[in-house]
Amino acid sequence: MSHITIANDELRKQFQYYERFGLHVANGNSFGLGAAQAAYEHGEDWYQALLSYLKENLDYLDGALKARVPQVKLVYPEATYIPILDMQALGMEPEALKHFVWDEVGAALNAGTTFGPGGERFMRINVATQRKNLELFIEKLARALEARK
């Protein structure tokens, strides 16, 4: 279940148009509605544990980068679990960086260029994952950079 706010009048009209045709984009099912209610009424402990876990993963990633790959800097997110990796110090052009991360490191990160001008040489990484995935990423990134020397 999710919530949507559409400030743009034209986009809201388009959304409402499609909604009328029964695409069920605005209607939750009984399981989803019950789960959402339970989460709002009884989910505070789980939510706080999740926030703690995400913070621990961010801190792990930051420390591991500083220790193993200091030329890559973590930019802590302001409100999400998807921080930005500042990879400018690697000296790669944006397309080369994307292919390096995707093909040589083997990580499906979001290229910063996807998000507009200024995103060159930056990548987004999702830390809402198991710690072992972040450990594997650090290991593969360090090895791929070492192989390029």
Describe every region a protein language model picked out.
Residues 1-149:
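PLP-dependent class I/II
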